[in-house]
Amino acid sequence: MLSLLALAMMQLPQNPSPMTDSTRDHVRVESRAVAGAHHNLSVGTLLVPYGRMATRPLVVHFHGEGNLVETVIHRWRDNAAVISVVAGGGSDVYAAAIGSGEKFRQLLAEGQQKCSCVFRPIYLTSFSAGYGAVREILRDPLSVERVDGVVLADSLHASYETGDKPGPVVPADLDSLFDFAKLAAEGSKRMLVTHSEVFPGTFASTTETADYLLTQLHLKRKAIMRWGALGMQQLSEAHLGNFHLLGFAGNTAPDHLDHFHAIYDWLKKL
């Protein structure tokens, strides 16, 4: 767990937060071995649950401990194939790991060969720095055609136009994510974005990038007070077509990690 927490918070240098939280439960999903065949791929590891299926849902997840990723996703569907990619800390590391949309499409072909099945639907999920890979994949139109939905679990950051001081976000850092959000809002794709209140200080927080997406989509948040998965406290939401944005309380590392453990719930809401 500590190793995942360390990976989760390692991106660009950020201002350390002294904040702690003892209000919310921060329930954790316990990692377990998921029954199935594991295959090492050119990027990441593929889990194919036992039992033959001609068509099988696939989740490609970026950033998190492999067994725990599989456990969390199988709370959503226990027949789903899972490709888990753990590349280290920092969005640039994940962008480099996937490299390009072409490499992603090759990864899908490699996985389908191992599975002896067709992957459908195909969902991308990321936590924390993992968004770097998702952003690169969605910059490739042919890969966008293959991807049915995206979940960003407290996992969308950008640089500031003012460098390491708070200011406007760099639009180019969010270009492909915004384009996919538009497709989801129009109904042809599905997208769910969650964010905490963690404020890194030296690069745009998930709240600031969420606000950017909402502005570009001409959407406004609705303030709410609702219990979420695993004891999380939801404070806001916005919906348009198949695009969903959920805002949650919390500015501590455990609050950030909540979003990873709740990925099964985000997939249900997708």
Predicted regions and their residues:
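Glycine-rich nucleophile elbow surrounding the catalytic serine of serine-hydrolase chemistry
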Residues: 126-137
